[in-house]
Every structure is written in structure tokens, then in C-alpha cells.
Amino acid sequence: IGKDYVDNTSHLAHGVSILTACRENETAMELGGHGLFTELLVSALQGGAADFGGNITIGGIYAYIDRSLGAWSQRPIFKTNVSEFIPIKKVQPKVPLEVIRELTALFATPQQLFDLDPSYEDTNSLQIKHSVIEPYANKENVTKFKLLQKLQSIGFVEPVGEEFMYFAAMNSKQCRLTTLGQHYWRLVHEDRI
């Protein structure tokens, strides 16, 4: 008079990770004669899953594939027994570390709002035919703005009061560090990057 049940647990040795295309009761999808999971896996390994430093880890690969599949019925399975993610591949970082190290030069504190104006936008110049706004492009500000835009591309900086950095500059708004950017600001400040 007891309950029968099957224990479908898996036990992984330390350092082992398993990543599969789908659950046992699902079918792996194909797109144009190729497995969708395999296509996403290859894309992840080519750099799509790289972190800001160009490191590709199994966790990053899973996150990339999971995000890419979205709400589709196929769900990848990821099981791991690791205490840290070791890079399995390194690619060229989207933004060089030298740019990330500029965080503390651009922002005195992690919470600082960076004031922008049209002088930060290099196309706001009398040499380019279109409407220009004072203050005109300033070489020093343009250099800083390009750094800020690179940092925005990896999620470290965001415009305040505008959707795009261009309009934040042209409309004299501000930008700020994101929560992730604040974390890396502290790492740079502590000379850990």
C-alpha cells in the first residue's frame, strides 16, 4: 500500500555540464534542413554568447540559445555541476578592455549622471550639410561620446530621458551607468580589470 514512483534524477560529477536541444518528449526543430539548436550553438560559439571580455562559457551558450528560442515550444535543457564557469572559447571582445577601463574617467561615481549636449555628436558640425545645433561638435566631447556609445552597446551605459544616445546628446539630456555598468565601474575602480 505504498506509492510507486520513478526517481528521474541525474547525478553529475563536479565539472560536468550537459546541454541538449530539447526535452525527452519534444522534437528538435529544423529550419531550412538544419537543426535550429545546432545553428544557434554554432552562432553562440562564433561569438554570439561572448561576454564583455570575449569569453564564451557553457552558461553563456545556454543563455544565448534560450533567449534566441524565446517562446517556441522547443526548450533546451542545461544541467551542470560547476562552481565557476570556465571559458571554453575566447573571441575578440565587442568593446576593448581599454574602453571599459575608461568608466572611472567618464563617471566620478557609479551613480553620477553624465551631462550631454550637441557638442558630443560628431555629425553636429558645420562641415556636414544638415541642421546643426550649438554647441557644435567638440573633438574632446565626441571622443568621450564614442566611448559612451561603445559602453552602451554592451549594456554598461543608458540614455536618460531619451531612447537613443544620439537624441540624449542632441537634446542636452544625460546618460548613466546601468546596474551592470556600476558593478564594472567598481571593478575598474578597485583595479580588478
Where is each model-derived feature located?
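Cysteine endopeptidase catalytic domains of the caspase/legumain-like
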Residues: I1-I193
